[in-house]
């Protein structure tokens, strides 16, 4: 049996050509063995009809096995030639034939250097993706922190607004300067709050771009 690797043919047929030839060989061999059993049984029946012939069953079996070895040797020689013809002319794919799944390589050929460059580019893109993912995660954490700060500042602003209203309703001359001071601080906190809101909007836009 041939041991020549036929990987492309195996890809096309779904089985190795050598396996196909082996199955054909075993099928012929089984048929030959079965035929010899039939021939032996026919000879034995013929001998039973000839009582004058002094030939034992053992001699018949020995002769049958000898003939079987002769036939098998001839069959192996013929099958070797048949296998060579089938593997070359029937079960082989010419060098100029491409399988459908391999035609893309013909349309877009590339060298080993180009393949290595492509692998390097893919590796760089993967690193960039990981870096952008880490940056996005950091921005999301910062955004959550800004939201928490904004919530606390809103509480402080509400407290100052309430205090200012109380001073307006129940204020006296003694609280005038305190009221002015509190009002100025309230405006400063409002400015800080607006600054925080603007930063939060910028962070959201940057996160959307990522």
UniProtKB/Swiss-Prot annotation:
One of its GO terms (biological process) is kinetochore assembly. It comes from the Eukaryota. Pfam families: Mis12. Its main location: nucleus. It is found in: Chromosome, Centromere, Kinetochore. It comes from Gallus gallus. Part of the MIS12 complex which is required for normal chromosome alignment and segregation and for kinetochore formation during mitosis. Essential for proper kinetochore microtubule attachments. GO terms for cellular component: MIS12/MIND type complex; nucleus. Keywords: Cell cycle, Cell division, Centromere, Chromosome, Chromosome partition, Coiled coil, Kinetochore, Mitosis. The keyword Coiled coil applies. Belongs to the mis12 family. Residues 124-208 form a coiled coil. This is Protein MIS12 homolog. The keyword Cell cycle applies.
């Amino acid at each position: 049996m041939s041991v020549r690797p036929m990987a492309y043919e195996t890809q096309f047929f779904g089985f190795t050509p050598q396996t196909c030839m082996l199955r054909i060989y075993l099928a012929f061999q089984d048929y030959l063995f079965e035929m010899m059993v039939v021939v032996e049984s026919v000879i034995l029946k013929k001998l039973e009809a000839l009582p004058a012939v002094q030939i034992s069953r053992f001699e018949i079996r020995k002769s049958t096995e000898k003939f079987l070895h002769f036939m098998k040797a001839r069959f192996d020689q013929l099958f070797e030639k048949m296998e060579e013809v089938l593997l070359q002319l029937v079960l082989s794919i010419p060098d100029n034939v491409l399988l459908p799944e391999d035609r893309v390589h013909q349309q877009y050929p590339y060298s080993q250097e180009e393949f290595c460059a492509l692998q390097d580019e893919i590796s760089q893109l993967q690193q960039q993706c990981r870096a952008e993912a880490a940056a996005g995660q950091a921005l999301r954490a910062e955004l959550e922190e800004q939201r928490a700060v904004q919530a606390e500042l809103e509480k402080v602003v509400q407290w100052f607004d309430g205090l200012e209203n109380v001073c307006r309703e129940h204020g006296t001359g003694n609280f005038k300067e305190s009221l002015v001071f509190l009002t100025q601080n309230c405006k400063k906190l409002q400015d800080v709050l607006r600054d925080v809101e603007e930063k939060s909007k910028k962070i959201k836009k940057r996160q959307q771009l990522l």
